[in-house]
């Protein structure tokens, strides 16, 4: 057993993968598209399982999903599956029900195949100093424009000084995330990521600076970019051997 597992709190990961990814214009959900020799979801799962502090990964799938069980990673004893709901928050809640007595839970997008181990380690380190949790995020570098309501015309430029792109994984105490998600769902709040549920309840999660190449594959052009990042990483790994 690793020193991480002995000295630091147990962390369970939840991977919501019940969406259909209609913006990809593909014949299958985006998480099952192949990039860098593996499906996107396999890359996402392996990036978590390679860290010694991640004890289990709970994959939340669509009730009609027949593809995940065919993947070799589905046979890993550290993998559990559960059916999700029609919204991300419902799917995450379904995953949390299988988390048992874990102290901390980490939620990662199934469509983010390029997570770096050092980013994950930095995020996990906040369990030693925070009771609220935090997220990987990247400072906004582009000039941001707000549009006029209902039309594609610029209303004004948004000050990017304190703007961040929210990424995943996002890490929170299990019971706190359950409480905040339940309240947000009950009150009809739009939960676009787990941090927004905590924000709704008055909490302020930590922003942990992450790499901007931790992209979410959402549109067809993202596949080529993910392929480039993964190929580049593999090349660097081979050069270091």
Swiss-Prot record:
- Known EC number(s)? 2.7.7.60
If you read the UniProt record, what top EC class would you report for this enzyme, in one word? transferase
Q: Where is this site: Transition state stabilizer?
A: 23, 30
Its keywords, alphabetically, are:
Isoprene biosynthesis, Nucleotidyltransferase, Transferase
Specify the pathway.
Answer: Isoprenoid biosynthesis; isopentenyl diphosphate biosynthesis via DXP pathway; isopentenyl diphosphate from 1-deoxy-D-xylulose 5-phosphate: step 2/6
State the Gene Ontology terms under molecular function.
Answer: 2-C-methyl-D-erythritol 4-phosphate cytidylyltransferase activity
The reply on keyword Cytoplasm is no
Question: Which InterPro entries has this protein been placed in?
Answer: IspD, IspD/TarI, IspD/TarI_cytidylyltransf_bact, ISPD_synthase_CS, Nucleotide-diphossugar_trans
How it assembles, according to the record, is: Homodimer.
Please give the function described in this protein's UniProt entry: Catalyzes the formation of 4-diphosphocytidyl-2-C-methyl-D-erythritol from CTP and 2-C-methyl-D-erythritol 4-phosphate (MEP).
Q: Which PANTHER family match?
A: 2-C-METHYL-D-ERYTHRITOL 4-PHOSPHATE CYTIDYLYLTRANSFERASE, CHLOROPLASTIC
Name assigned to this protein? 2-C-methyl-D-erythritol 4-phosphate cytidylyltransferase
| Name of the gene encoding the protein in the UniProt record | ispD
């Amino acid at each position: 057993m690793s020193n991480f597992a002995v000295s630091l709190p147990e962390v369970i990961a939840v991977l919501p993968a019940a969406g259909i990814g209609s913006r990809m214009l593909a014949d299958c959900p985006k998480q099952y598209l192949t990039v860098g020799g593996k499906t996107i979801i396999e890359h996402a799962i392996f990036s978590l399982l390679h860290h010694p502090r991640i004890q289990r990964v709970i994959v939340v799938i669509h009730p009609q999903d027949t593809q995940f069980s065919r993947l070799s990673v589905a046979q890993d004893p550290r993998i559990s599956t559960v059916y999700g709901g029609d919204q991300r928050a419902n799917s995450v809640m379904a995953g949390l029900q299988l988390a048992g007595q874990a102290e901390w839970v980490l939620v990662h997008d199934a469509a983010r195949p390029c997570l770096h181990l050092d980013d994950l380690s930095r995020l996990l380190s906040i369990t030693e100093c925070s009771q609220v949790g935090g997220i990987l995020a990247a400072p906004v570098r582009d000039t941001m424009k707000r549009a006029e309501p209902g039309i594609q015309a610029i209303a004004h430029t948004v000050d990017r000084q304190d703007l961040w792109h929210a990424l995943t994984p996002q890490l929170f105490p299990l019971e706190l995330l359950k409480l905040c998600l339940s309240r947000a769902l009950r009150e009809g709040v739009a939960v676009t990521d787990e941090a927004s549920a905590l924000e709704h309840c008055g909490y302020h999660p930590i922003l942990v600076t992450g790499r901007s190449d931790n992209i979410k594959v959402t549109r067809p052009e993202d596949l080529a970019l993910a392929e480039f990042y993964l190929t580049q990483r593999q090349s660097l790994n081979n050069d270091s051997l």
